[in-house]
């Protein structure tokens, strides 16, 4: 059974473990700790009591930015990322947020397809933004209009 709840400070070690497993260039523990507080809307998705995914989002006035989302590799391809994003979008709409922004690696075709299926559109590209093992790659900036 899947449950979505707030990502609390006490949940950060489990989220950090997922971050390490899910991303080739993961955030540091310090970055994780600094993305908590009242201006953040952070969620976790647990499956049978174990954290399987998380999302970290900053809300400023009527805009939000999804800073990080990850699904544990053992739980990928089960629709958990979609469920977490749909929950986030619903919560942002309740708060009157007009636009949700995110950036994604140009090579992350699965994530781009998910975002597009939820209504995100490409806004711009940041050239050579992300590090790779052999250089840099572009970030695609995407936006989802939520409410007016």
From Swiss-Prot:
Q: What is this protein called?
A: [Ribosomal protein bS18]-alanine N-acetyltransferase
Keywords linked to the UniProt accession? Acyltransferase, Cytoplasm, Transferase
List the catalytic residues: 103 (proton acceptor), 115 (proton donor)
Q: Which organism is it from?
A: Escherichia coli O157:H7
Function, as annotated, reads: Acetylates the N-terminal alanine of ribosomal protein bS18.
Q: Which GO terms describe its molecular function?
A: protein-N-terminal-alanine acetyltransferase activity
**Which reactions appear under catalytic activity for this entry?**
N-terminal L-alanyl-[ribosomal protein bS18] + acetyl-CoA = N-terminal N(alpha)-acetyl-L-alanyl-[ribosomal protein bS18] + CoA + H(+)
Among InterPro entries, the record links this protein to: AcTrfase_RimI/Ard1, Acyl_CoA_acyltransferase, GNAT_dom, RimI, YpeA/RimI_acetyltransf
Gene3D superfamilies, per database record: 3.40.630.30
Tell me yes or no: is Cytoplasm among this UniProt entry's keywords.
Answer: yes
Primary enzyme class:
transferase
Which NCBIfam families does this one have? Answer: PRK09491.1, rimI
């Amino acid at each position: 059974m899947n449950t979505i709840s707030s990502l609390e400070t006490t949940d950060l070690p489990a989220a950090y473990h997922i971050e390490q497993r899910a991303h080739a260039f993961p955030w540091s523990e310090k970055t994780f700790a600094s993305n908590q507080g009242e201006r953040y809307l952070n969620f976790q998705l647990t499956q049978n009591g174990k954290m399987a995914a998380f999302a970290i989002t900053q809300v400023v006035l009527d805009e939000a930015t999804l800073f990080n989302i990850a699904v544990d590799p053992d739980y990928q391809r089960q629709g958990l990322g979609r469920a977490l994003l749909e929950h986030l979008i619903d919560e942002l709409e309740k708060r009157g947020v007009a636009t949700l922004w995110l950036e994604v690696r140009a090579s992350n075709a699965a994530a781009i397809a998910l975002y597009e299926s939820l209504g995100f559109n490409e806004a711009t590209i940041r050239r050579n933004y992300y590090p790779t093992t052999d250089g840099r790659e572009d970030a695609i900036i995407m936006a989802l209009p939520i409410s007016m």
